[in-house]
């Protein structure tokens, strides 16, 4: 509920400053200052107060719009578009409340559902989190979006892979994209959004989706031990709204001149 109180499910992004720079080498840089804030808070309600009742309702507090002093993110972004189709992002993210605990901090993109073949160099093959990752070794793995889904009785976040060096998502013909970060990052690719999984009380209630959701995160909050009574994750295993810098590059793969991944160095060939 604290995430709904801050409107994190419904962030709207507004560029308050923008510049376009064309470089002689053919690169194009786009710089933005982006403010991300929800219109208002919301409240998640369940029938009879039971979270497993089968019916969830999200009540938006439209009568209490957010203002300047309510929670928001501000990010300074530099996007560089290269002649080969690669897109690089350098981002510095701050929030109005550095102490707020977040589910994750990073970026999400939607890709066509036909892009369902995964390869990654990180912790796997079982999904893992900050406080439950050392049992999964860092190797190169192949998977599919369908295999990343875990049939929990109550749908929830899943499929996270910590300390990822690079990850690719493609169609069965091998055409798609590869994401490489400056530092190891958390990666997931699922056929359902976080909101879909929050609202669905059982797997059969998940709506069909024609897109896959790919997350690239600087930090993901760990799981803790609430299910067994030990409490939430420790502070160092939580994602906070504190100032964060992250950068990654998205490169095309499968097309002529696209990127290939070196199995020797486990890094993309630049």
Specify the residue positions occupied by each region the protein language model found.
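Beta-strand/loop-rich accessory regions of lumenal/periplasmic or secreted enzymes
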Residues: 1-270
